[in-house]
Design a protein with these regions (language model features):
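Active-site-proximal, substrate-binding regions of enzyme catalytic domains
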Residues: 1-111, 115-138
Length: 138
């Protein structure tokens, strides 16, 4: 089994095919759910991205037993700060959840999925390049 821990943007890009891969278990952070809630009601987001966020939330609800939800706790972020200095952002909280999932839930079986280059660079410090996947359009 492969465990793929998705950040928010990679989920939005990939939700149509999220649960189609055989032998893959999806994992997300509670921070991702918060971000999706904010996106779907934000006056700063365009209609297409808001629709995608709504659709993704429905896909997650319809498949609620097919993914793991890791609830963010501040102690998770503190572990990242022990070795590197970062700003406390939602991306870093998502990364902290993914690192916790990889360390305590499915050690060395987790692939972190992101299309955010800055987050990918930070994730490389904890996961290594072979455990990070980038989501691309098309």
């Amino acid at each position: 089994m492969i465990y793929k821990f998705y950040d928010t943007c990679s989920l939005l890009l990939n939700y149509q095919h999220l649960f189609e891969e055989e032998g893959v278990r999806v994992a997300i952070s509670s921070i991702t759910l918060q971000e999706l809630e904010e996106i779907k009601s934000s006056f700063r987001k365009d209609a297409e991205i808001k629709f995608s966020a709504r659709k993704l939330l429905h896909v997650l609800e319809d498949n609620r037993y097919k993914y793991d939800l890791l609830v963010y706790k501040p102690a998770m972020l503190a572990r990242l700060f022990e070795t590197h200095v970062f700003e406390e952002t939602n991306d870093m909280k998502i990364l902290a959840c993914a690192f916790h999932y990889d360390t305590y839930v499915h050690p060395d079986e987790t692939v972190f999925v992101t299309n955010d280059l800055a987050l990918q660079t930070s994730a490389n410090l904890y996961f290594g390049e072979d455990s990070i996947t980038s989501v691309k359009l098309g």
